[in-house]
């Protein structure tokens, strides 16, 4: 549900709750989800995924997904364990990309939290997300008129319900004088605070920040699992490691793609020679007494061309040539075959 509410990795349909009001999502049978195009592109690649056997040994499951962007920093995380706790605040996706580019260029960068619920933030003591740091988050309060205040954005970690409760409690304690509070939140937060006659709106705003959840303090603690051990890092270090990991994944994907291209080039070259030289029509091939004799004949006919192939010709290569159907041979076009080989060579050159 949290991933769906972020609108980054999951395309959601139905009632997925509301992060502003704290309303929970509908039952699973009433909601639908699918991976976004972005998620399919940056989260999944079976060729670079590390797999392990499932608990019953019948299927394989991923040890981890080959994520090619700093998901931990974009999504944020919070948890507690024996003697440990973690509170990693979410960050703006665009700012993460910009910081990653600066890191790749060897330039200095700074990262600060960004909250989906809005509000303003004081990051002077953020301490790069490490222990001992703190950030102050404020709601956005506007004056509708002299007697009415409107809260348009709520602090991170709070909902309109908890915010209203804190305002009512402050009113009961005499910290602020209000007549009533109305929650008109829909797609965006909108809480109307009606002041009692004679109450200064400026003083009321100061009181809301001082005595209610309109201003909160958050203590980040960037604790991650590194090589199966807990480690305290800064968010900048997490980004650097994520970028290095992404670069290694991209290099691995390119090498896999290059290997596939070289295999395709090798067989395309074999196929072209096999068809152009009409090896399939050789009498010795057609009258071969067994499979070994047929393979041996094709191998000997390919001998003069082996220096131009991309690797050694194996028995499996020859067996694959023998499986080419006559329809494919009849439709063979030399120009198209050469164009295909040229395109694959160009792509290999770009990878190199």
Show where each model-derived region lies.
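Catalytic phosphate-handling regions of large nucleic-acid enzymes and associated NTPases
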Residues: 1-132, 192
